[in-house]
A protein has these predicted regions:
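P-loop/Walker-type NTP enzyme "switch/lid" segment
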Residues: 1-31, 136-138
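Conserved beta-strand segments of the P-loop GTPase G domain that flank and frequently precede/overlap
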Residues: 3-4, 38-39, 60-63, 90-93
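Inter-motif core of Ras-like GTPase G domains
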Residues: 25-35, 45-67
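G-domain G4 guanine-recognition motif of GTPases
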Residues: 63, 88-102, 124-132
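Conserved C-terminal guanine-recognition region of P-loop GTPase G domains, centered on the G4
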Residues: 69-88
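Beta-strand-loop-alpha "switch" segments that mediate conformational coupling across diverse proteins
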Residues: 115-143, 155
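NTP-binding/hydrolysis catalytic cores, primarily Walker-type P-loop NTPases
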Residues: 137-169
């Protein structure tokens, strides 16, 4: 996982040549792994779209708040327009229950079906877990710090789906 730095703005003013070089370097890096996940953060900026072009699949992570739902829909809409045929999957994050996660996903799904005529599948749901802020504060993965927590179990289910196509865990 290559995580974006929150609020850094480091990619905003990157030149086209440097962006191309970054994309090439990521492809070299990816060759040594089963999957590479890049956290681009929310947004529809050209830099995010250019990096998205090299992806085989896009995972859209959304919470049940209005702004993230709107941002997720906007990202899918712009990406679908600029990169026809791109596959999307959705993860409902920081939800209080599986039912709330399904409700969050269905809100986004209904908008995508009504206006974009696509139905991105639900990849998984990650429940709100008090262990996550602890892991963040210690700069440790939730899977390392609290491997038996609800959030860690949810992340593992998603990882299995990504690594083993067709799994329904």
């Amino acid at each position: 996982i290559i995580a974006g730095l929150s609020g850094s703005g480091g990619l905003v003013n990157i030149t086209a040549n440097r962006l191309r070089m970054l994309g090439d370097d990521l492809k070299v890096l990816a060759a040594g792994y089963d999957q590479v996940l890049i956290d681009l953060g929310a947004g529809v900026e050209q830099t995010v779209q250019n990096l998205t072009r090299s992806a085989g699949q896009v995972i859209v992570v959304v919470t049940d708040e209005p702004t993230p739902l709107t941002d997720a829909y906007a990202f899918i809409k712009v990406t679908q327009t600029e990169i026809p045929g791109m596959g999307f999957q959705v993860v409902a994050n920081i939800v209080n229950s599986m039912r709330e996660g399904e409700r969050t996903y269905n809100t986004l799904l209904k908008a995508c079906e009504a206006f974009l005529k696509i139905s991105p599948p639900l990849l998984g749901i990650i429940r709100r877990d008090a262990k996550v802020p602890e892991a963040i504060r210690s700069q440790t993965s939730i899977l390392t710090r609290s491997p038996n927590s609800e959030a860690a179990c949810d992340v593992e289910k998603i990882a299995k789906k990504l690594l083993i196509p067709g799994i329904r865990s």
